[in-house]
Amino acid sequence: MPTEQNTNLIPASGFSQLATFQMEDMAEELNGLEGGFDRIKIPSGGMTVFEMPGETEDSPETVKEFSAVILYHHPILQYYREKYTGGSNPPDCGSYDGVTGVGTPGGSCAKCPLAQFGSGENNGKACKSRRRVFLLREGELFPMILSLPTGSLREFSRYIKRLLSKGRKSN
């Protein structure tokens, strides 16, 4: 006589418990630690590879290309009174929404003379437009940040428009 088989491998409630367990573990591990998201460095100055965070800060991984999912993206505006030479020094004025600048001069970005063409080097803008993209790579739990420079914004805009024209969002 055939016996009835139980096809329930894991009760549905087990998944939420597993997720809670993982979140609790992460919260415990991160308790008291500081730091933001790891950053992906875009090729510059003749380089042809991206610099990805490695196991340690001294051993980054270099790749020609990588795959990731866009979780979120937003505009950033940055104005440096002196020419920016890299490093982690904050801009004299910056905006994380592309609307309101914080710092000197601060205020409405749309009305700011530093956000107009002709205010910067080679008739460009003194206040540079960038795009911060939060990416999640396969096998990772935390997003990474890719900060797109002004020269990459046109192609990123085209990509987003292609997605939208197909009825899809980037995230």
Task: State the predicted function of each range.
Residues 128-171:
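Extended serine/threonine-enriched, polar tracts that run as long, contiguous segments within proteins
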